[in-house]
């Protein structure tokens, strides 16, 4: 499976007096712009995910919706899963993806959870990557039990913007 992992775009700061509860934090105007720019690069690369999974947290759902819009994918194909909540065990993502058994998927989530998943895929005890907000990693998953994968690339939002222009 070709798997893309995308961290949500910049969201309202926790220190902002208007900040809602954690699960309801939303993308800022800058976050929406950065996410759209990253999504345009993904479209140019030609990704075509059969599966789109997101954390149920608002900022991750918004990120997924923007990517759906840019890729021309129906938003109804974006599915929220507790496996992508920040506190979920990385193994839950693998279990969810194994059940779906598709050739290409994208997951929208949070740091350090997505970095923990990448480490889990390599059998590492600690994260060895740092996904930036609106950054994307691409993995080729060879097996789900045990989970094994190769990291193809990891792009920061800045690199995505430069590739998309």
Predicted region positions:
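A polyampholytic, Gly/Pro-enriched intrinsically disordered region
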Residues: 97-106, 148-157
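Domain-level recognition of soluble alpha/beta enzyme cores
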Residues: 124-150, 156-160
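Acidic, His/Gly-rich catalytic cores of divalent-metal-dependent hydrolytic chemistry
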Residues: 162-165
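Beta-strand elements within well-structured catalytic alpha/beta cores of enzymes
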Residues: 2-6, 104-109
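Active-site catalytic microenvironments for nucleophilic, acid-base chemistry
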Residues: 41, 66, 70, 99, ...
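Active-site-proximal alpha-helix that buttresses catalytic centers in soluble enzyme cores
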Residues: 2-84, 88-91, 114, 127-134
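Non-DNA-binding regulatory cores of transcription-related proteins
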Residues: 99-104, 111-135
């Amino acid at each position: 499976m070709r798997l893309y992992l995308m961290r949500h775009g910049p969201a309202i700061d926790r220190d902002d007096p208007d900040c809602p509860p954690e699960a309801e934090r939303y993308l800022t105007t800058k976050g929406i712009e950065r996410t759209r720019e990253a999504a345009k690069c993904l479209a140019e690369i030609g990704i075509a995910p059969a599966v789109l999974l997101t954390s149920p947290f608002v900022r991750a759902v918004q990120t997924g919706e923007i990517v759906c819009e840019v890729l021309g994918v129906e938003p109804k194909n974006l599915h929220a899963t507790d496996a992508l909540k920040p506190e979920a065990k990385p193994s839950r993502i693998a279990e969810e993806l194994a059940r779906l058994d598709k050739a290409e998927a994208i997951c929208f989530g949070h740091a350090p959870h997505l970095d923990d998943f990448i480490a889990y895929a390599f059998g590492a005890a600690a994260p060895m990557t740092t996904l930036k907000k609106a950054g994307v990693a691409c993995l080729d998953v060879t097996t789900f039990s045990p989970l094994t994968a190769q990291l193809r690339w990891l792009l920061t939002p800045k690199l995505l913007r430069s590739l998309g222009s």
